[in-house]
Amino acid sequence: LEEAKTLFSLANSKGLTVTPYQNRRFDSCFLTTKKVIESGKLGELVEIESHFDNYRPVAETNPGGPQNGEFYGLGVHTLDQIISLFGRPDHVSYDLRSLRNKANPDDTFEAQLFYGDLKAIVKTSHLVQIDYPKFIVHGHKGSFVKYGIDQQETSLKANIMPGEPGFGADDSVGELVYVNEAGETVREAVPLETGDYGRVYDALYDTL
């Protein structure tokens, strides 16, 4: 944290811009959820839940400080997604735990961000064995659910590079149910927005 403060202070003193690599703002699952929210079909939002879970029950001993846990390692991305949508919350509560190996920093967390009547829940666990939604959003007029995570990282691990056929391929859809202006219940399969981590640099260019 002190190093980050030093960097931002240095940038401000020299009139420069410094930014972390917030690539998760350009996950396909997040961009799709964002588009649904911005469509207004859900009405006034009351709750959004974000999960980044997997099943890895064994954790080798790897002691470290809080900066080595999941809250600082992954939460900086999933919390940033929420903040990019709604800004700074009115108040926050959180629960950090180490469940697989007590010698290690936190591997499980839940943060709750409150914006008036809207509550945003951000969770990560390595002890979730069933398929659980990546995003769940509820509003006065409807609900949206998206299973499955962005596949760009999976493609990169398989040596499929950006621009190549099949990069980030994902044929899943989101499920949207809402009440339209005629009072009718509408069900929609929402196609995925295209994820693109390269847009981080486009956004930085626009800022500069």
List the model feature ranges, each with a label.
Residues 88, 116-118, 142-143, 184:
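Short acidic/polar mixed-charge low-complexity motifs
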Residues 6, 32-35, 81, 110, ...:
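Alpha-helical elements of Rossmann-like donor-binding domains used by nucleotide-donor carbohydrate transfer enzymes
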Residues 1-17:
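Rossmann-fold NAD(P)-binding glycine/threonine-rich loop
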Residues 111-117, 137-140:
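Active-site beta-strand termini and strand-to-loop segments that position acidic
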Residues 76, 123-131:
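Glycine-rich phosphate/pyrophosphate-binding beta-alpha loops
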Residues 14-17, 24-102:
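Predominantly a Rossmann-like dinucleotide-binding segment in NAD(P)-dependent oxidoreductases
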Residues 139-208:
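C-terminal glycine/acidic-rich active-site capping loop/insertion
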Residues 103-108:
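A short, glycine/Asx- and small/polar-enriched loop/turn
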